[in-house]
Amino acid sequence: MARNSRRKQNTIGNLLTALIVIIAIFLGANKVNSNRQLTNSNQNQTQTQQKTGLGGLSQAEYQQLAKLDFKSGQAAYIQVNRGKSTLNPQAWQENKVIYANLDKLNRTSASNTAFLERRNVANDSLRVRQYVEPTGWHGNHPGREIYNRGHLIAYSVSAGIDQSGKYNPQNKSGDQNNPKNLFTQTAYANQRVQTIFETKVRQALRRDCKVVYQATPIFRGNELMARGINLQAVATDGSLNFNVYIFNVQPGYQFSYATGQAQTSPGWQVK
């Protein structure tokens, strides 16, 4: 009887030990799976953030561009990042424009970023007279048009976008007289140079491309007139990709960027 009792106790003990081991293994496996799921979740979140991040001009790049001095005879624009945009094409989610607020000096010193499509190509006949005077603005004299109200996001590619940045199908015009989208720009930089890249964007939109387009006037310190403007764009299908810095200069004139005041300089050349 004693032997049978011991055998039963040993059997029960062995069964309990085995059961404890099985439970421990099960719990451990669940913990590992839970950790794996958490890790995978974090990785997916990081990947999603990387895919949806806007990109574009960084603060460090802004400061580097602000330090550049134009020299007579230099080209009107230079490539940035070897001409490749740092915008993320996957950030295009809806047709809109993000208009940055004016800074404490009432300057458009931050990036405006547009998410554009074909319907944003504007009808030129709907333009109206501009009256906003951005910082650094000085009136033009007859026969001497050197100042322009430069758009960050061009009128020609902003049809239907209201001043809040939302698309309104009732608004057939492009952006006009929006203080958050204008800066004092030279006629040469605006009409001869910036238009080159605005045309590229417009052509891409007419091909039914979706385009992320960013424009950032570059100011040095507390100066009221921008030293230049960074333009970059990328199409979601990869057919458009540029990144340039346009100097805010005018042949035959030099500017005090602190005030925007111009003085004649016949030998001042821009290529």
What are these regions, as identified by a protein language model?
Residues 1-11:
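N-terminal Lys/Arg-rich, disordered targeting/topogenic segments
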Residues 13-14, 52-61, 197, 266-270:
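Membrane-embedded alpha-helical bundles that constitute the cytochrome b-like, heme-associated redox core
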Residues 28-39, 231-234:
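Hydrophobic single-pass membrane-insertion segments
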Residues 33-89:
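N-terminal, intrinsically disordered, polar/charged segments of Gram-positive cell-envelope systems
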Residues 68-117, 244:
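Polybasic, low-complexity association/targeting segments
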Residues 15-29:
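Hydrophobic membrane-insertion alpha-helices, especially the h-region
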Residues 12, 40-42, 246:
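Intrinsically disordered, low-complexity peptide-like regions
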Residues 109-271:
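Domain-level detector of nuclease and nuclease-like folds
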